[in-house]
Amino acid sequence: MKAILVFALIAISIISVNAGMMTGGSVEQDASQKEYSDKAWKAVKGINDQASNNGPYYYAPIKVTKASTQVVAGISTKLEVLVGESNCKKGELQAHEITSSNCQIKDGGSRALYQVTIWEKPWENFEQFTVEKIRDVTADEQF
């Protein structure tokens, strides 16, 4: 009886340790890493193509607030990105031309939170962006 109890405790311990390292599971990342900021800038076109940005100015990334990755026939990166109204007016340049050097965030401009999912298969030179607005953000809200 004592041997069965010891075996059960060891089995539970092994299962608990391995559950924290689930293969193929989503892994939280440090959202402040430059690679995630770069990915947010690459998603600018998708963010601005959303019908929810119907103002006269393009949105630009302010900050990546959350990041996670998952291995799924490539790598799926999920970002939560705070964006703000920039000083770049629609019609004066194309959304894919927006960069951090030519578009700055407007003081007092509108802000929103978007979820950006990037599916990458580097060996196939494949990259797919999915963008979804989460919600509008008030000017005094801190991240």
Curated annotation (Swiss-Prot):
List the ranges annotated as motif Secondary area of contact: 70-74
Can you say where in the cell this protein is located? Cytoplasm; Secreted; Cytoplasmic granule
Asked if the Swiss-Prot or TrEMBL record annotates the protein with the keyword Disulfide bond, the reply is: yes
Disulfide bond residue pairs: C88-C103
Might you name a Gene Ontology BP term for this protein?
positive regulation of vitellogenesis
- Which terms in the Gene Ontology molecular function aspect does this entry carry? cysteine-type endopeptidase inhibitor activity
User: What is any Pfam family matched here?
Assistant: Cystatin
Superkingdom of origin organism: Eukaryota
Q: What is its main location?
A: cytoplasm
Q: From the UniProt annotation, give the residues forming the signal peptide.
A: 1-19
Sorted alphabetically, the Gene Ontology cellular component annotations on this record are: cytoplasm; extracellular space; vesicle; yolk granule
- The reply to whether Signal figures as a keyword in the UniProt entry is yes
Q: Give the keywords, sorted.
A: Cytoplasm, Disulfide bond, Protease inhibitor, Secreted, Signal, Thiol protease inhibitor
What tissues has this protein been observed in? Expressed in germ cells, developing oocytes and sperm, sheath cells surrounding germ cells and oocytes and in the eggshell (at protein level). Expressed in the pharyngeal gland, pharyngeal muscles and some hypodermal cells in the tail.
Read off the SMART domains from this record: CY
In terms of PANTHER family, this protein maps to: CYSTATIN
To which protein family does this belong?
Belongs to the cystatin family.
Function description: Cysteine protease inhibitor which inhibits members of the peptidase C1 family. Does not inhibit asparaginyl endopeptidase. Required for the uptake and/or processing of yolk proteins during the development of oocytes, probably by regulating the catalytic activity of cysteine proteases cpl-1 and cpz-1. May play a protective role against exogenous cysteine proteases derived from soil bacteria or fungi, or rotting fruits and vegetation.
Q: What is this protein identified as?
A: Cystatin cpi-2
Give the organism's phylogenetic lineage: Eukaryota, Metazoa, Ecdysozoa, Nematoda, Chromadorea
